[in-house]
Amino acid sequence: MARFNLATLLVTLFLAVCTFSFVSAEGRGPVITDKIYFDIKQGDESLGRIVLGLYGKTVPKTAENFKQLATGENGYGYKGSTFHRVIKKFMIQGGDFTNHDGTGGKSIYGNRFADENFKLRHSTPGLLSMANAGRDTNGSQFFITTVVTPWLDGKHVVFGRVLEGMDVVTKIENTPTGSRSKPSVDVVIADCGLLPDEPAKEAAEHAEL
């Protein structure tokens, strides 16, 4: 009887640990697999840097598209493009590196690709989500929310969030705009790319010493 009780206790403890681990992992939110930087300029003024974390485990295809467009490894991408649409208390939109007005852009998979999934909600400001022209029309255009936008759930794919530089997003949000919500002075992604993995970077720095 004592042996049975011990076995039962061990099984119960094991299940409790597994459950706690699962809940803890879920509580941390989506896994960030890559960090992308945007260095922003408006006219001759540097507005600062935005660092974006990509949810490559939850939406790997969408995250990979954004990453490769940020690095420009295919010969085209976000560098030099603008935030062409800015709506206060809503979002800032960019990613049209072909026409620069919201009518263009393309993905690394061709012109357009399908909605990957809608697992993540627009539940907080600072989320990175795909702009589209309807179902399964993702290309290169994206937006960053500045408020909670639940009406976009199930229509736009959330694939990352702002890790640093929300103050820069706010500067862009507050810039004067003209027709079609286009900034009066172009807001440009002057430089962009993939930030090195911090543990790998630290190891390399120590190796050089």
From Swiss-Prot:
GO CC list = endoplasmic reticulum lumen; fungal-type vacuole
Q: Name one Pfam family in it.
A: Pro_isomerase
Q: Which Gene3D superfamilies match?
A: Cyclophilin-like
Q: Which InterPro entries match?
A: Cyclophilin-like_dom_sf, Cyclophilin-type_PPIase_CS, Cyclophilin-type_PPIase_dom
Q: Its Enzyme Commission number?
A: 5.2.1.8
Q: What is this protein called?
A: Peptidyl-prolyl cis-trans isomerase B1
Question: Does the keyword Magnesium feature in the UniProt annotation?
Answer: no
Q: Which residues are glycosylated?
A: N138
What lineage, starting at the top, does this entry show? Answer: Eukaryota, Fungi, Fungi incertae sedis, Mucoromycota, Mucoromycotina
Q: What class of enzyme is it?
A: isomerase
Which source organism? Rhizopus delemar (strain RA 99-880 / ATCC MYA-4621 / FGSC 9543 / NRRL 43880) (Mucormycosis agent)
Activity regulation, free text: Inhibited by cyclosporin A (CsA).
Function description: PPIases accelerate the folding of proteins. It catalyzes the cis-trans isomerization of proline imidic peptide bonds in oligopeptides.
What protein family is recorded?
Answer: Belongs to the cyclophilin-type PPIase family. PPIase B subfamily.
Q: Which domain of life is it from?
A: Eukaryota
What keywords is this UniProt entry annotated with?
A: Endoplasmic reticulum, Glycoprotein, Isomerase, Rotamase, Signal
Write out the catalysed reaction: [protein]-peptidylproline (omega=180) = [protein]-peptidylproline (omega=0)
Q: Where in the cell is it found?
A: Endoplasmic reticulum lumen
Task: List the ranges annotated as motif Prevents secretion from ER.
Answer: 206-209
Classification via PANTHER family: PEPTIDYL-PROLYL CIS-TRANS ISOMERASE, PEPTIDYL-PROLYL CIS-TRANS ISOMERASE D-RELATED
Segments forming domain PPIase cyclophilin-type = 37-194
Q: GO molecular-function annotation terms?
A: cyclosporin A binding; peptidyl-prolyl cis-trans isomerase activity
Against CDD domains, the record matches this protein to: cyclophilin_ABH_like
